[in-house]
Amino acid sequence: MDGISDFRSATAREAYVEVYDRVLAALWPVPPCPADVVTSLGTVRLYRHGPDGDDPFVLLSGAGGNALAWYRHVAELGVDRPVVAVDPLGECGRSVQTAPIVDGADAGRWLAEVLAAIGAERAHLVGSSFGGWTALQQVLHHPGRVGAVTLVDPAGFAPLGGRFYRWLVLGGMAGLLPAGLRRRAARRLDNSTLLETELLRLGLAGRRFRRRLPSLVPFTDAELAAVGVPVQLLLGERSALHDSAAVAQRVAGVAPGWRREVVPGTGHALVLDDVALCTRRVREFSPTRR
């Protein structure tokens, strides 16, 4: 259906799900605890870990990704707090979109409905790249149920430029190379995703998925200033997505209460470039925890 992300055929979906389940079994560090949440825009797949509570870490991957992108973080984050890793609606994964997502308000709506369904009252949203954009859309358009947000090299803070698209295309090509060449390309491109053989296999299995999500519109200064919850902003020093120093400077001017950090030696794939730092920063930034 036009305007709805989906696989090109039922056969393509079945083939993808088979690979997805194998990769989940290979990578997920704890016994998977899946659940499906029905929203007004589709059914959202999520995975729970950790103790019960109304203050989960809710993990949102970037464009083209899903919950499995967080496999290196789940166990540590769930030591003493609930974790919910999400297959974002409209991205390639086990979630199933049923209605168009036309703008940021829609992107925030499905997430708000998920938070309500899981009983979250003080969720800590953790969004990488496009997942960061989605997290802020929830806070701006459907406020409530969120106590804090961590943005990991998020999209939406500057227009997408040629440098990013070159990085994306070269990364896609490098993902098809043998492991040894991929390691060299990962260093040259500042892209740790190229070291993730299983995730690359999953991405290749999703090549017949059609993504139909709204074009990314950068946040205005007024929107950033209007965010009503504590925010932590982690930026990759060498990110191909934007000029990280300029983004940090902009945020310092319009949202001075945000915690800002440009992480040396990392790129746009910060969530994988420095897993330990990202996990530690998320756990430490819990301003609403009782």
Range-by-range predicted roles:
Residues 266-275, 279:
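Catalytic histidine-centered segment of alpha/beta-hydrolase-like enzymes
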Residues 194-222, 238:
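Hydrophobic, aromatic-rich cap/lid helix
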Residues 75, 232-266:
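Conserved loop-alpha-helix segment in the C-terminal half of the alpha/beta-hydrolase fold
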Residues 127, 131, 135:
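Gly/Ala-rich beta-loop-alpha elbow adjacent to hydrolase catalytic centers
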Residues 45-93:
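Conserved HGGG/HGGXW glycine-rich cap/lid loop of the alpha/beta-hydrolase fold
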Residues 1-57, 80-81, 121, 283-290:
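Alpha/beta-hydrolase fold catalytic core
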Residues 84-126:
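Active-site loop/oxyanion-hole signature of alpha/beta-hydrolase fold enzymes
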